[in-house]
Regions:
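Short histidine-centered loop motifs in beta-beta connectors
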Residues: 141-145, 149, 182, 186-210
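Surface-exposed, short loops/turns at beta-strand junctions within beta-sandwich domains
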Residues: 347-353, 433-438
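Short hydrophobic beta/alpha edge segments that flank linear recognition/processing sites
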Residues: 178, 207-222
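Solvent-exposed serine/threonine-rich low-complexity stretches and specific carbohydrate-binding patches
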Residues: 324-335, 420-426
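C-terminal outer-membrane/trafficking sorting elements
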Residues: 381-390, 394-460
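Edge beta-strands of extracellular beta-sandwich domains
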Residues: 366-374, 452-458
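Aromatic sugar-binding surface patches on proteins
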Residues: 333-346, 426-429
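Surface-exposed, glycine-biased beta-strand/turn segments
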Residues: 21-175, 209, 218, 243, ...
Length: 460
């Protein structure tokens, strides 16, 4: 579905103490390019597989023999949620809606009579809603930050898994997907999932609304991690869950979103400007939460559906709660599917030590992130990572790539409790399977020079 292109921003540095429209040091827009999510032959095979499964499930009494003609009885919740242990305010953007213009190519119309959809010369008109991850999509995919959940209760009538999930271009590759039939006979397709992330429930099993079906990946014909959500009528016709001037049927959403659902996804602190790498390499966020007086600090904000003229007020607060600096910014571009902006600043050598706060206020919503300024010690320093931990997610043993020995290793559970500690680790492996419980763990590596680095690891 996507690969990123980034519109470079201005290369400035420094802050004005209480500036109003402060130009960013860098940033820009992120527009996922389109790719045919499912080829005609793949779609034909999927529909045949689903028909076979439905017939078998009806024979087994797991599905009704027939469904009454709509009126619609199903109401959809949003099919994506953030996994436990993560703190972004939002995790997605929308790149494409259903195409209502049957002509092709380059003849598109979404439900709002806009052009946020696509077609191609082979006759494909986009048949679903593409929901992409933002920011740092492959990083989010690798740590399984975005969970795909059942938009409505129903019965699983199809599953595909085991296909490669780091694709970067349109292709004939098969995807990983779950298909759920609802009580009114409509069917939801959840496509491009991460390999081996799918629910263990079998075809014929029931799922509740909001139940986890898998996590977002880039399997199949895809240019980056996203969910392709597609809705079908009991007779197989493509349905648009959105209602608007060019799709006048009632909305399927329990809480319909606006066409431009402008929101701030997160604010982050960086030691250097974030780097967006070429697909499928994870990005290099250069995140940090610990600084010393005199260090270079990068404050960044990440948006989806940002519109021209929408102002954000940014403020940095000192440990005593007073304002260190504040400024505002608004984009002049009509619309970005996703965007980011950052400002760089050198902290004064006399900067007060303690916990600081970076805050952004946008469209009535406040998002903030704390960072520390203080003396360098083994618990606060943040330097470029020397270690890589893989595989991640893991089922048992995690490999360490980096200098050995590690002076001390501490593993924390989601409650912040130390569940394992190892002194003077000399072998490049950690057996996390011994911890028993699946979930998100924090691995803290104390280096020989007295500094530390931390890694999040998901254990299945």
């Amino acid at each position: 579905m996507k690969n990123a292109y980034l519109t470079a921003g201005l290369l400035l540095s420094g802050f004005a103490g209480f500036a109003q429209n402060q130009a960013p040091s860098g940033g820009g827009g992120y527009q996922p390019p389109a790719a045919e999510c499912v080829s005609a032959s793949q779609r034909q095979q999927m529909e045949a597989d689903l028909a076979t499964n439905v017939a078998r499930l009806r024979q087994q009494g797991l599905l009704p023999a027939a469904h009454a003609a709509r009126p619609m009885t199903v109401s959809l919740n949003w099919p994506l949620r953030q996994a436990a242990g993560f703190d972004y305010a939002n995790i997605h953007g929308i790149s494409n809606f259903v195409d209502h213009n049957a002509a092709y190519p380059n003849a598109v119309q979404d439900y709002n009579c806009g052009t946020r959809t696509y077609d191609n010369a082979s006759g494909y008109n986009h048949a679903g809603t593409d929901i992409f991850l933002w920011p740092f999509s492959y990083n989010m995919m690798d740590r399984q930050q975005a969970e795909i959940v059942a938009a409505a209760p129903g019965v699983i009538i199809g599953k595909y898994d085991g296909n490669y999930d780091r694709n970067c271009a349109m292709s004939n590759a098969n995807w990983n997907a779950v298909y759920v039939q609802h009580t009114d006979g409509s069917v939801a397709w959840y496509g491009h999932m991460k390999t081996n992330s799918l629910t263990t429930k079998a075809i014929g099993a029931s799922v509740a609304q909001g139940e986890r079906l898998g996590t977002v990946g880039s399997s199949g014909s895809s240019t980056g991690p996203h969910l392709h959500f597609e809705l079908h009528s009991p007779t197989g016709a493509v349905l648009d869950p959105y209602s608007g001037p060019c799709s006048t049927a009632a909305s399927w959403w329990a809480s319909p979103q606006t066409y431009y659902n402008s929101a701030l996804n997160t604010v982050l602190l960086h030691r250097a400007a974030p780097v967006f790498n070429t697909c499928p390499t994870p990005d290099t966020p250069n995140e940090s939460s610990a600084y010393r007086p005199g260090d270079r600090l990068y404050t960044a904000a990440y948006y989806h559906d940002q519109l021209a003229g929408q102002s954000t007020q940014y403020t940095i607060y000192q440990p005593n709660g007073t304002v260190f600096t504040t400024w505002s910014h608004s984009s002049s571009t009509a619309h970005y599917a996703a965007s980011y902006w950052y400002w760089s600043y050198t902290l004064p050598t006399t900067a007060p030590t303690g916990t600081w706060r970076f805050q952004a206020q946008y469209l009535g919503t406040t998002v903030s992130r704390n960072f520390t300024v203080g003396v360098v010690n083994a618990t606060t320093v943040a330097r470029p990572a020397q270690y890589t931990l893989y595989p991640n997610p893991a089922t048992d043993v995690v490999q360490l790539s980096g200098p050995l020995p590690v002076a001390r290793v501490e593993v924390f559970n989601p409650l912040g409790q130390v569940v394992r500690s190892i002194d003077n680790l000399r072998q490049p492996t950690l057996n996390l399977g011994e911890l028993g419980a699946a979930g998100l763990y924090l691995v803290r590596l104390h280096r020989a020079d007295g500094t530390v680095e931390q890694h999040k690891v998901v254990l299945h």
